[in-house]
């Protein structure tokens, strides 16, 4: 992987991790364009995912600081309930990761057709949430957290946007837009770090291929993903507040159709 390829893929990861257009789907498309095999860029994937975690920590640091300050009061307060909701939201993705990891990895290797189909599904979900007008709720309940977690678990499929699925689901449930966007970005931190840790351990044990990627490419990819992630995270929170997700539905529909056509021509 050349440094300019790492730059482009890092930018793609940083932007699409937060924008509701599927980071996994766009990385699959970008890797296919550059001729990069999925098994050969595991180290790069870990690096750019960790970079987006740092982006979240930077942009949402005030919220994270608020959570920890309240959590260490060791009492049942709003901060503790927030953490409980995040833990509840992790249950579905944890089950998928433990029991269905091999099946998910097999789907990732199935080509661009599944990516295109899932992008169309993302477009449909975003459109539905845009036109639906449920009554707004002030706080995210435990039940809502679990349902949003189910949406996150489904979004392990390449092309089905994680942020799009979780935010659209929360909007359909009537959750507060600003709080929903923040919750969506915070709830993904533990799963990303957990997956990165497991993949890193596999590389150390020799159970997975790290890929012969130059250090410069890893550094460039990390910086690109971090910077673009910071911009996208802040931008996306404002987009959700203003209710402008329909534009991303149109984008996903167009890219989905093009991806399906290209997959059939290969």
Curated annotation (Swiss-Prot):
Keyword entries, A-Z: Antibiotic resistance, Cell inner membrane, Cell membrane, Cell shape, Cell wall biogenesis/degradation, Hydrolase, Membrane, Peptidoglycan synthesis, Transmembrane, Transmembrane helix
| Main location, first listed in the record | membrane
Q: Which residues form a coiled coil?
A: none
- Reading the lineage from the top rank, the first entry is Bacteria
| Xref: Pfam families | BacA (PF02673)
Write down the membrane topology.
Multi-pass membrane protein
Example GO CC term: the record gives: plasma membrane
Localization per record: Cell inner membrane
Q: Which parts pass through the membrane?
A: 41-61, 82-102, 106-126, 140-160, 180-200, 213-233, 245-265
What is the catalytic activity of this protein? di-trans,octa-cis-undecaprenyl diphosphate + H2O = di-trans,octa-cis-undecaprenyl phosphate + phosphate + H(+)
Keyword Nuclease belongs to the record: no
Task: Report the enzyme's class at the first EC level.
Answer: hydrolase
Keyword match Repeat = no
Which EC number(s) does UniProt give?
3.6.1.27
Gene Ontology MF term list: undecaprenyl-diphosphatase activity
- Which GO terms fall under biological process for this protein? cell wall organization; peptidoglycan biosynthetic process; regulation of cell shape; response to antibiotic
InterPro entries per the UniProt record, alphabetical: UppP
The function of this protein is: Catalyzes the dephosphorylation of undecaprenyl diphosphate (UPP). Confers resistance to bacitracin.
Q: Give the family from UniProt.
A: Belongs to the UppP family.
The miscellaneous comment for this protein is: Bacitracin is thought to be involved in the inhibition of peptidoglycan synthesis by sequestering undecaprenyl diphosphate, thereby reducing the pool of lipid carrier available.
Q: What is this protein called?
A: Undecaprenyl-diphosphatase
């Amino acid at each position: 992987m050349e440094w300019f390829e790492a730059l482009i893929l890092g930018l793609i990861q940083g932007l699409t991790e937060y924008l509701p257009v599927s980071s996994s789907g766009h990385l699959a498309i970008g890797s296919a364009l550059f001729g990069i095999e999925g098994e050969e860029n595991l180290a790069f994937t870990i690096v750019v995912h960790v970079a987006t975690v740092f982006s979240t920590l930077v942009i949402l640091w005030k919220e994270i600081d608020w959570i920890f300050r309240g959590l260490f009061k060791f009492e049942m307060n709003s901060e503790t309930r927030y953490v409980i909701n995040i833990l509840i939201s992790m249950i579905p993705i944890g089950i998928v990761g433990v029991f269905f990891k091999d099946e998910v990895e097999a789907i990732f290797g199935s080509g661009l057709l599944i990516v295109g189909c899932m992008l169309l599904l993302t477009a449909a979900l975003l459109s539905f949430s845009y036109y639906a007008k449920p009554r707004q709720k002030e706080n995210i309940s435990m039940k809502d957290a679990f349902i949003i977690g189910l949406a996150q678990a489904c979004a392990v499929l390449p092309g089905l946007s994680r942020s799009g699925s979780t935010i659209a689901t929360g909007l359909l449930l009537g959750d507060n837009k600003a709080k929903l966007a923040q919750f969506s970005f915070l709830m993904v931190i533990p799963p990303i770090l957990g997956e990165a840790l497991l993949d890193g351990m596999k590389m150390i044990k020799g159970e997975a291929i790290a890929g012969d990627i130059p250090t410069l490419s890893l550094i460039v990819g990390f910086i690109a993903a971090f910077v673009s992630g910071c911009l996208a995270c802040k931008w996306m929170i404002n987009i959700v507040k203003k209710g402008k997700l329909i534009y991303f539905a149109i984008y996903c529909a167009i890219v989905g159709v093009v991806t399906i056509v290209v997959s059939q021509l290969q």
